[in-house]
Each structure stands twice: as structure tokens, then as C-alpha cells.
Amino acid sequence: LVGSEMCIRDRQRYVQERIIPQYVGFDKAHQIDHAEKVIEESLKLALHYEVDSAMVYTIAAYHDLGLCEGREFHHIVSGKILLADETLRQWFTDEQMLQMKEAIEDHRASNQDAPRSIYGKIVAEADRIIDPEITLRRTVQYGLSHYPEMDKEQQYERFRKHLADKYAEGGY
């Protein structure tokens, strides 16, 4: 049990010191607070299922790291980053690594297909964080960060369309 607890602490320390700080370089809607909130929400959701909480924690921590190469394929790049992280292999099997990679690839809300596993469903749901104030703030921050050339009216239209596309009936 002592070795197991050390293993958990080592893994969490690694994620906190080496993975989470990478979010500092992303847009205002995808900073450290976003990663921490997705981890928190993912772990809450995980309590309702028979899942490996270490995998849930790790998936949530890595889910947006691919933003380092842009938004369009960030979910694919994030999965590749996780799979390429040799440090994780001291805690996870090859099969677990593949499951986590797939869950990260599947987390994107705009994906046409449902996530392949419960792990993908958990992180996808946690990433949607339906706190209205946070959702609105992140949508505005994303627009200002990625479309600085837009005036107020254009920003508002982009904001309105995004919220309708994502959260209205039939939204992704």
C-alpha cells in the first residue's frame, strides 16, 4: 500500500509540475484554471462509474495539450502527446495508454461520433462545463484571442452563433 500511495503521489506531482503548466501558453479560455476545472469535473463524474480514476485524471490533464499546434486538430495532437509521453508508461500499461489516447481524441464537442469509451464520455462532458458564467466568459475570451480583428458587432455575432451551435437544441 505504501508503494501504491507513493506511485499516486509521483504521478500527480509529475502532472502538476510538468503537464498542467503547459496550459499557460494557450488562449485565455484554455489556461491552467480550465485544465484544473476539467480534472475536477471529470473526477466527480468518474465517481458514478467503475473506472480507473488515475486514467480519468490523466486524460483530463492532457485533453487540450494539442492546442500547442492549433485548435483544429488539437484533440488528435493531444492524444499523440499523451501516447508519446514515456514517463506515463511507469504507471500505465500499453492498453491503458491507448484507451487514454482514444478518450482524448474523442473529447472534442464538435466530433460527429460519440466517444468510444466511458473515459471519452467523461472528459467530453467535463470539458463542456455548463456553468453559464464560465461558458460565456470563455466564449468571449476565445473570440478576442483568436479574432482580434473583429469589431464588437462581429464578436457578438460569432459569440451568439457559437453558443447556438454548441448549446441550442440539436447543437453539438
Kindly give the residue locations of the regions a language model identified:
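An active-site-proximal "capping" alpha-helix that borders the catalytic cofactor pocket
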Residues: 38-42, 73-88
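Generic N-terminal amphipathic, Lys/Arg-enriched alpha-helix
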Residues: 14-25
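Divalent metal-dependent phosphate-bond-processing catalytic cores, especially two-metal-ion Mg2+/Mn2+ enzymes
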Residues: 23-51, 62, 109-172
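His-Asp-centered metal-binding catalytic motifs of divalent-metal-dependent phosphohydrolases/nucleases
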Residues: 53-70, 74-78, 99-108
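Hydrophobic, well-structured mid-protein blocks that either form specific transmembrane helices
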Residues: 80-113
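Short, well-structured alpha-helical segments
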Residues: 32, 36-39, 57, 94-105
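Short, small-residue-biased leader/transition segments that mark boundaries at the very start
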Residues: 1-8
